[in-house]
Amino acid sequence: MPAGVPMSTYLKMFAASLLAMCAGAEVVHRYYRPDLTIPEIPPKRGELKTELLGLKERKHKPQVSQQEELK
């Protein structure tokens, strides 16, 4: 095996790394909870709003890009 590591140690590290990666992906997926509903009419440009579960109210005004100000 690479760098003289025994096969059993290599497989243990591989399994631990794979388990940690899958657990991390599950935590992120549960935290952000994607909206999997498909709207009938797509939202107009600038209408789609997303928020994190922990942020229910905005503490500041959303920033408007310079391109949207020119319209």
Swiss-Prot record:
Mitochondrial matrix compartment residues: 1-8
Record protein name field: Ubiquinol-cytochrome c reductase complex assembly factor 6
Keyword Mitochondrion among UniProt keywords: yes
Ranges of the Mitochondrial intermembrane topological domain: 26-71
Encoding gene, per UniProt annotation: UQCC6
Alphabetical UniProt keywords: Membrane, Mitochondrion, Mitochondrion inner membrane, Signal-anchor, Transmembrane, Transmembrane helix
Gene source species: Homo sapiens
Family: Belongs to the UQCC6 family.
Subunit relationships: Interacts with UQCRC1. Interacts with UQCRQ. Interacts with UQCC5. Forms a complex, named COMB/coordinator of mitochondrial CYTB biogenesis, composed of UQCC1, UQCC2, UQCC4, UQCC5 and UQCC6; stabilizes nascent cytochrome b/MT-CYB and promotes its membrane insertion. Forms a complex, named COMA, composed of UQCC1, UQCC2 and UQCC4; activates MT-CYB translation. Forms a complex, named COMC, composed of UQCC1, UQCC2; UQCC3 and UQCC4; mediates MT-CYB hemylation and association with the first nuclear-encoded complex III subunit UQCRQ. Interacts with MT-CYB.
Entry GO CC: mitochondrial inner membrane; mitochondrion
Induction data: Up-regulated in response to glucose, serum, fatty acid starvation and AMPK activation using 5-aminoimidizole-4-carboxamide-1-beta- D-riboside.
Membrane-crossing residue ranges in chain numbering: 9-25
Protein's job: Required for the assembly and stability of the mitochondrial ubiquinol-cytochrome c reductase complex (complex III (CIII) or cytochrome b-c1 complex), a multisubunit transmembrane complex that is part of the mitochondrial electron transport chain (ETC) which drives oxidative phosphorylation. Mediates early complex III biogenesis. Participates in regulating the levels of electron transport chain proteins, and therefore energy supply, in response to changes in energy demand. Also required for cytochrome c oxidase complex (complex IV) assembly.
Annotated signal sequence range: none
Main location: mitochondrion
